[in-house]
């Protein structure tokens, strides 16, 4: 954590966890020590100007952010849920490379009065779930909650990280699970639901770490996580690889719609291309995982992007331009 920053405006009546940043950092330090234990000899975690960690080569490095009003609504998610999501979506990028996370730092920008310990508890809970140690971060003021997480990871074995650019014509396409659950969960929350599997999928996404490592062991040619909707992320993989794609179906989560599966986003299932489907299935079985779901194939026609022989709708979310992909100007 970096040094204290002035808190704008009067602090009378502000929750102590924000009015006194040093005290907040001290409580977060105790929280991380309770969950992760003391750092190994030679490492420094939360509390200094920078963390000191042992790294392996090659090092995986990814960052992601969640923003109030874009990625979550506090009417539907607790602060702990927000912290969980912030770390998990960054860890998902490590999973998409076939790696496993090691350490994370988290910046929390929050309005006055925000219970930052609850946010930190959610981050730490996810860190414990994904074996990712929280080793530092920053705390500052903002008009809305923004959490930015940077995660490091490593690769087991000698195989290289899996990129999204390695697919070739003839490769078969798979996903690790049904899609659309998060979007359906948000829809249910807006309609008054407060619990259920779909709501859980929206509030507490899962990173497919075991699946990503199994896919890498199976020699998949390309892989990425489905964060912005299958229709959009599939186009990204196809563009990076210089291939077309032809889907024969979309696995829709129970209670979700096909539109939510194609464009809802925040599923964090893994999209994989492989030249050896049997090897992929065997790797998943050996790891005790549910079988990957076959959805289509890569083609030589780079302009092809079809679903059941028809042009696939351009659904998904473009965060940089702040509107659904279907509303992009051509």
Region annotations inferred by a language model:
Residues 183-201:
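Short, compositionally biased
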Residues 152, 271-275:
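Short hydrophobic/aromatic beta-strand micro-patches
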Residues 56, 66, 100-187, 297:
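Glycine-rich anion-binding loops of enzyme active sites
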Residues 113, 200-267, 299:
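Active-site-proximal betaalpha loop/short-helix elements
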Residues 3, 7-9, 203-206, 282-330:
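Acidic, Ser/Thr/Pro-rich beta/coil linker or hinge segments at domain junctions
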Residues 79-103, 118-129, 210-214, 232-237:
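Small-aliphatic-rich amphipathic alpha-helix that forms the alpha element of a beta-alpha
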Residues 114-117, 276-283:
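Short, conserved charged micro-motifs
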Residues 1-78, 97, 102, 106, ...:
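Extreme N-terminal cap/leader segments of soluble proteins
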């Amino acid at each position: 954590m970096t040094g204290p920053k002035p808190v704008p405006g009067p602090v009378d009546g502000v929750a102590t966890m924000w009015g006194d940043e040093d005290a907040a950092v001290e409580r977060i330090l105790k929280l991380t020590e309770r969950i992760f234990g003391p750092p190994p000899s030679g490492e420094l975690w939360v509390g200094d100007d920078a963390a000191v960690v042992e790294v392996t080569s090659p090092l995986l490095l990814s960052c992601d952010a969640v923003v109030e009003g874009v990625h979550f609504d506090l009417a539907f998610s607790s602060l702990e849920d927000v912290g969980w999501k912030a770390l998990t979506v960054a860890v998902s990028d490590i999973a998409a490379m076939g790696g496993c996370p090691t350490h994370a730092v988290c910046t929390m920008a929050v309005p006055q009065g925000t219970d930052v310990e609850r946010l930190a508890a959610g981050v730490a809970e996810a860190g414990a779930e994904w074996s990712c140690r929280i080793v530092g971060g920053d705390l500052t003021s903002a008009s809305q909650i923004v959490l930015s997480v940077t995660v490091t990871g490593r690769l087991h074995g000698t195989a290289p990280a899996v990129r999204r650019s390695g697919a070739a014509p003839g490769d078969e396409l798979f996903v690790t699970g049904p899609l659309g659950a998060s979007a359906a969960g948000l829809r249910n929350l807006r309609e008054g639901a407060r619990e259920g599997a779909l709501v859980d999928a929206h509030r507490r996404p899962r990173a497919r770490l075991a699946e990503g490592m199994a896919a890498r062991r199976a020699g998949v040619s390309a892989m990425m996580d489905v964060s912005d909707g299958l229709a959009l992320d599939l186009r990204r993989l196809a563009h990076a690889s210089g291939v077309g794609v032809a889907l024969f179906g979309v696995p829709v989560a129970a209670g979700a719609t096909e539109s939510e599966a194609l464009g809802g986003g925040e599923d964090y299932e893994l999209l994989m291309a492989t030249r050896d489907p049997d090897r992929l299935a065997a790797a998943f079985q050996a790891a005790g995982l549910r079988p990957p779901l076959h959805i289509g194939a890569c083609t030589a026609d780079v302009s092809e992007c079809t679903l059941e022989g028809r042009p696939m709708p351009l659904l998904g979310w473009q965060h940089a331009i702040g509107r659904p992909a279907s509303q992009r100007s051509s």
